[in-house]
Amino acid sequence: MQYHEQFDVIVVGGGHAGTEAATAAARMGLNTLLLTHNIDTLGHMSCNPAIGGIGKGHLVKEVDALGGIMARATDLAGIQFRTLNSSKGPAVRATRAQADRLLYKAVVRQMLENYPNLKIFQQACDDLIMDGDRVAGVVTQSGIRISGKTVVLTVGTFLNGLIHIGMENYKGGRAGDPPSIALAQRLREMPLRIDRLKTGTPPRIDARSVDLSVMQAQYGDDPRPVFSFIGDASQHPRQVPCYVTHTNERTHDVIRNNLDRSPMYAGVIEGIGPRYCPSIEDKITRFADKTAHQIFVEPEGLTTHELYPNGISTSLPFDVQVQIVRSIRGFENAHITRPGYAIEYDFFDPRDLKANMESKYIGNLFFAGQINGTTGYEEAAAQGLMAGLNAGLRAQDKDPWHPRRDQAYMGVMIDDLSTLGTREPYRMFTSRAEYRLLLREDNADLRLTAIGRELGLVDDERWGKFNIKMEQVELERQRMRSTWIHPQHPSLEAVNALVNTPLTREQNLEELLRRPEVTYDALMAIEGVGPALSDHAAADQVEIQIKYAGYIERQYDEVEKQLRNENTLLPLDMNYRDVNGLSNEVIAKLNDAKPETIGQASRISGITPAAISILLVHLKKHGLLRKTA
């Protein structure tokens, strides 16, 4: 049966990657279909009810700067907001929000159902329609054939998903949802490298059975940070605290005594789990010297009693989970509402993707999210936006676009995945970026919104607010350069009280703000110096640009040097055995990875600077020197 309409972009899967992919394509004015096995689970938070964190918050801000929905949904559903690393430099400060799980899902669904150019259809995807070596649509579980110029796969943990609780296991995409078996089998028939990964989740607990009074309360920040560049704290619902408790030696003894009943340690689970979000079994084994591990007790929402004990993800049998939970301070009488579990699933080697998220081997087919070996809502959302954007560009026969490593954490992640691949669930950290000072949360809009506008991702409302902010920043910087404090200034005494070294010569406000001990707010509070900008985001931007100007300039110089050969193209059909002077090891690695550019090649383990020089000589000699735009 043929579906009555053809689409420019078909997105398979309605999680965090799929919703961003579908809305990105729709914002570009393209006829877009979001295909999901269950409309009621659109935007569902399968794991912890939180958005952001170090590295992750940066990705959310970048998604928002390009018009994405995650930050706005979080502002409407966030029940606790904090800035992490607030005492450190601006490069590593990160926003994190606790979200009401049900409210977040409802907000996302409402956004999707009212999105221009976007249709939603409830059917599982079982097959792809092929036209030679290109995809031309999808086939649903009930045999409906839907034609599309491009297809984006954002299927999360559903491909051959296998859920483990102790020695028992059953097929599932996540708890309560069926797996995708037919599509997984179809993809295994294609020329794609495939492997298995694992992730897990803790048991959920009824708050009425917990003694929160013996735990440490953790409140949100005041004033509250806002996630979206066009958001406001007034949008936030009622705010609530989280709580902190710890495991203890009794907890650890229970786990050690039951490791033989763990599917991970009994060899039942083959997939590799996330290094930076390990199960409690892993923690006890890997950090045997630790007598306690922190547990963040997170409310699931404002209308439920369920708690999410972040830090005790487990796949041990249910009876052991009860013992573990009840050994923890405050949980002595805890009632578990849902058992914890581990899930194994198929993922595809992201080295088989171009930097625009398109398969190197199957034209018009794009991948985003956990199918690429990543973990986390934020990583999925960022990939989804890039895949949806580039699927939209492909549908219009336009050139692809992706950010470089110096432009966005998105660029860092995509380059890491497509160049180096991953053997374990990939998670974003600020430490993965070489140019952290350029890739701050606060300047994500400065870096990306103008580009997003050109690509058709940024609407008039966001563009207007962005330009107002930019004008405020520029005018304030001009004012600070042209406002001078001289030794006879009536406010000299107040200025000298602010600085470590009193003024002996005339200085403008910009010079004063460069001093480490001076803040923008304190300087503006001096009579005759202000008024301060009323927009706190614009004021922060002024302060950071002035205080860190020298460091920022140095990073731009480093970027300029690095870019000289970064974008030199390497033909995808190039046989590196034909390049004289390369070692067998280098030839094997380059033929395996098939890098798109010299920059990608240079980041492959074992590819030496000498090998890069040989490649450049070969390209020049054969008239193959080309650069990306």
From Swiss-Prot:
**GO annotation, biological process:** tRNA methylation; tRNA wobble uridine modification
Where does this one sit in the cell? Cytoplasm
| Keyword terms, alphabetized | Cytoplasm, FAD, Flavoprotein, NAD, tRNA processing
Cofactor(s) required, per the database record: FAD
Q: Which Pfam families match?
A: GIDA, GIDA_C_1st, SAM_GIDA_C
Q: What Gene3D superfamilies does the record tag this protein with? A: FAD/NAD(P)-binding domain, GidA associated domain, C-terminal subdomain, tRNA uridine 5-carboxymethylaminomethyl modification enzyme MnmG/GidA
Q: How does it assemble?
A: Homodimer. Heterotetramer of two MnmE and two MnmG subunits.
The name of this protein is tRNA uridine 5-carboxymethylaminomethyl modification enzyme MnmG
State the organism of origin: Aeromonas salmonicida (strain A449)
